[in-house]
């Protein structure tokens, strides 16, 4: 069994799509638009076969997102090496994204950093 896909509602669909393509190597489909409901989505595919669906529909409330809350905490992406974690973290920080931890080795042995990226949602970058 595998999780397929992960889905994320966002307000700025194009900015989110660009983020995942630029920083994490996602490939995007052409998108879907339901003219009746104005629902829009893209499926973003990654080299290992994982897919992320990013979605938008009009007038969605965007409530504050506390870093520590119930529900999903973050989406983690493995970039393959400590050096790549370091390099991507530096790039994201220089492009204005908030780094909230790392890069570091966690108590359970993961080498990672965590950023606040997409509309207050956390992205973890790991080996």
Predicted regions located by residue number:
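Exposed loop/turn and edge beta-strand positions of beta-sandwich/beta-sheet ligand-binding modules
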Residues: 38, 71, 109
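Vicinal oxygen chelate
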Residues: 31, 45, 89-127
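N-terminal beta-strand motif that seeds the catalytic metal site of vicinal oxygen chelate
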Residues: 1-15, 72-77
């Amino acid at each position: 069994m595998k999780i397929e896909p992960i889905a994320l509602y966002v307000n700025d669909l194009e900015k989110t799509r660009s983020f995942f393509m630029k920083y994490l190597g996602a490939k995007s489909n052409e998108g879907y638009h339901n003219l009746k409901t104005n629902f829009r989505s893209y499926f973003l595919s990654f080299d290992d076969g994982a897919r992320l669906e990013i979605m938008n529909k009009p007038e969605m409330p965007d409530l504050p997102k506390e870093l520590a809350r119930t529900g999903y905490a973050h989406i983690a992406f493995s970039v393959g090496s400590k050096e790549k974690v370091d390099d991507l973290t530096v790039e994201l920080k220089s492009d204005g994204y908030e780094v909230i931890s790392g890069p570091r080795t966690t108590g359970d042995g993961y080498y990672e950093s965590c950023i606040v990226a997409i509309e207050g949602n956390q992205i973890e970058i790991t080996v």
